[in-house]
């Protein structure tokens, strides 16, 4: 899930629609609401956030540090002003990257993925996706590849696979996966739907790989395990 902070409801709603077309859930906040939320959100919920997108708002300068107090997810600022000085200021405030409008959400997703690669990972990461064993994921709306061949998954299953690979080495519980895929405020869908998605995903991966790469332990959660 991606959190968008902007003074304008029209902007946060627009991002929700655009990211939704790529299968990505977003939640929008005004700066005031964001302050209240980031102060009280449970640890497991904020750890499910994949990135923060900071738009035009009076508190743009202090939000990166506020986020860093709770989370290490990528922070990207959207610069509405064609000003080099403002772009440099945003980097000084502590953002990981700055994009200028107009920008496609797939470019934002690619930049998020690039920030993660620079942070370091055990999987092979490059300009064209992240490779873990025979599986390559792209995290920008494209279907994953298995042994170099495109393999389409339903949107939710694809997002779960991307999330597991992005968090390789960590065991993720059902709540974390649900929050990342559906958003932390979605009360219309039951968390148990995650088990159904993962069951279908495991069956498909097993059919392609000849083994089950998703390790599960009761009460502890799931992790992807490929030598």
Curated annotation (Swiss-Prot):
Instruction: Give the SUPFAM superfamilies listed for this entry.
Output: C-terminal effector domain of the bipartite response regulators (SSF46894), CheY-like (SSF52172)
One cellular component term (GO) for this entry is:
protein-DNA complex
A molecular function (GO) held by this record is: phosphorelay response regulator activity
Q: Which domain of life is it from?
A: Bacteria
Instruction: Please give the Pfam families that the UniProt record associates with this protein.
Output: Trans_reg_C
Ranges where the Response regulatory domain occurs: 1-116
Name the Gene3D superfamilies on file: 3.40.50.2300, Winged helix-like DNA-binding domain superfamily/Winged helix DNA-binding domain
The answer, when asked if DNA-binding is one of the entry's keywords, is: yes
A single BP term in Gene Ontology: regulation of DNA-templated transcription
What residue stretch is flagged as signal peptide?
Answer: none
The record places the DNA-binding region at 127-226
Task: Show the PROSITE patterns listed in the entry.
Answer: OMPR_PHOB, RESPONSE_REGULATORY
Q: Which UniProt keywords apply?
A: DNA-binding, Transcription, Transcription regulation
Add the further remark from the entry: There is no cognate histidine kinase partner identified so far for FtcR.
* Role played: Required for transcription of flagellar genes.
PANTHER family found in the cross-reference section: REGULATOR OF RPOS, TRANSCRIPTIONAL REGULATORY PROTEIN TCTD
| Protein known as | Flagellar transcriptional regulator FtcR
Upper lineage: Bacteria, Pseudomonadati, Pseudomonadota, Alphaproteobacteria, Hyphomicrobiales
Instruction: List the gene name.
Output: ftcR
